[in-house]
Every structure is written in structure tokens, then in C-alpha cells.
């Protein structure tokens, strides 16, 4: 193989590695966003479980947020301690006793923790692959400079 052909092949391989690194970077960004969403959902489930635990306490005043941003908050003195509404998915809710709600929330927490673990594993593998490609590209760049 001629030197020119070898240089052409090397250039194509470098371009291929660069494309792979770019694709991995996008994939890593997507995984990080997905992980952040899952962790946010996990925290919301834990907060909901804590709220269910608070229902059983006597003589408590509750704050009910009118929206997600807290633009309006209602003080509530009386809450039915025997029933809660729990979101089942899509636009479905069920009225259940607090213990059933805790069971549903425990299951949801376990599912989200498993999803988080899987995403973190995939993220770790992707970052390792990206770093390996970046190292190769860095070495190639260093050899070009010599």
C-alpha cells in the first residue's frame, strides 16, 4: 500500500472516530438528561411517601400548593386521613387508603431506582468509550504535531 493510500485510510479512520465521539457525546447528553428526570421523579415519590406519613399526625395544619411553582398556597386544617388520591399514570387517579398508597409509592420508588441504576451503568460505559476515543484522537493529534 502506498504512503498516500495509508494517509487516506488513516484520515478516514480519524474521521470515523470523530463521528463516533460526536455520537457518543450526544448519547451521553441524552442519558444525563434522562437520569436527571428519573432522579427528580424519584425525589417526588419520596416526598409523596413522606406526605402520606404526615397525614396520620394529629392537629396539623397542611400547606396545599395550588401549582407547581408555589404561586398560591392554601392552609388546610382538615384532611381525610383514611383516603388519599394517588396518580396511577396518564390521567388516572385512584382513591385508596394511605397504606395502599404507600405500597404503590414503594413499588414506584423501586422501579425508578432500578431505572436510575440502569441509566447510570449505561452512562458510565458510554463515558468510558468516549474517553477511550478521545484519548486515541489526542494521541493522533500529538503525533501530527511532531
Curated annotation (Swiss-Prot):
UniProt entry tagged with the keyword Ribonucleoprotein: no
CC annotations in GO: cytoplasm; prefoldin complex
Major site of localization recorded for this protein: cytoplasm
An example molecular function term from Gene Ontology annotations: unfolded protein binding
Top-level taxon of the source organism: Archaea
Entry-linked Gene3D superfamilies: 1.10.287.370
A Gene Ontology BP annotation from the UniProt entry: protein folding
InterPro entries: PFD_alpha_archaea (IPR011599), Prefoldin (IPR009053), Prefoldin_subunit_alpha (IPR004127)
Keywords tagged on the record: Chaperone, Cytoplasm
Task performed by this protein: Molecular chaperone capable of stabilizing a range of proteins. Seems to fulfill an ATP-independent, HSP70-like function in archaeal de novo protein folding.
Protein name as it appears in the record: Prefoldin subunit alpha
